[in-house]
Amino acid sequence: GLWSTIKNVAAAAGKAAIKL
């Protein structure tokens, strides 16, 4: 659902932030 998508995007953004 929409919430799952939001969590997936947030997780991806978090991983990207860690790499930076």
From Swiss-Prot:
Keywords: Amidation, Amphibian defense peptide, Antibiotic, Antimicrobial, Immunity, Innate immunity, Secreted. One of its GO terms (cellular component) is extracellular region. Expressed by the skin glands. It holds the Pfam family DD_K. It comes from the Eukaryota. One of its GO terms (biological process) is defense response to bacterium. The keyword Secreted applies. The keyword Secreted applies. The modification Leucine amide is found at residue 20. It is found in: Secreted. Antimicrobial peptide with moderate activity against both Gram-positive and Gram-negative bacteria, and important activity against Leishmania species (L.amazonensis and L.infantum). Acts on both Leishmania promastigote and amastigote forms. Shows activity against E.coli (MIC=17.8 uM), S.aureus (MIC=32.3 uM) and the phytopathogenic bacterium Xanthomonas axonopodis (MIC=2 uM). Shows low cytotoxicity against mammalian cells in models of peritoneal macrophages. Belongs to the frog skin active peptide (FSAP) family. Dermaseptin subfamily. This is Dermaseptin-N1. It comes from Pithecopus nordestinus (Northeastern Brazilian leaf frog).
